[in-house]
């Protein structure tokens, strides 16, 4: 289940050009990794490792999030008239659904109690896809750092880390595809619709930021029983029991984000919003925080 990186080039491409469109779709198809969640060889855990895994409070939220994301992305393929880009979105929908299946397989194997959420039906294909995509940009960025933290601290045994490594790399592919799709989508709109598209994106981003600011302000306060709530990737370092400052966590996230994005063709536009916010915070907050 190793990732085969796309051909790395240095020349730039005009956003929305035929070359950009082909690269956008083809890179995603070429870097697909085939695995079947129901056939995964789950490692045997010690009683202590199993207790730690079962004690994490975010499994229900993770399952619910993947349910929403997978159904949203799968439906969003209908937005695209271009066969290559549509095929790439369909593949992403399949991969998101596979993440949901992987969580079901994991929680079933290790007997972690979660409820099956009702199937989510998108109301607005474009708006819901944008909301899910920008949300994934935030969640995946922090997940990169959390995964590195869990690996370094030994919270997850190496065998379990190996199982989830392809999932983390898929998340990198997803947000890389999404940020390029947003630019491509905007370029294909009539000039008079582009400002409205920008405003819609800005509104969604502000909602995502506000939600995470609210979560960050509640960190360290007692949480309701039964889960860690939304935006769990922002607070999961507390659940991992890791002695890590916010400054150190941001450093890990930035480093891991850069490492994972380096796998792919440099002509694709990189996510800038979330890494930019994280880089600013990293520079201004004390190392002890």
Show the residue positions of the predicted features.
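Non-heme di-metal
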Residues: 1-289
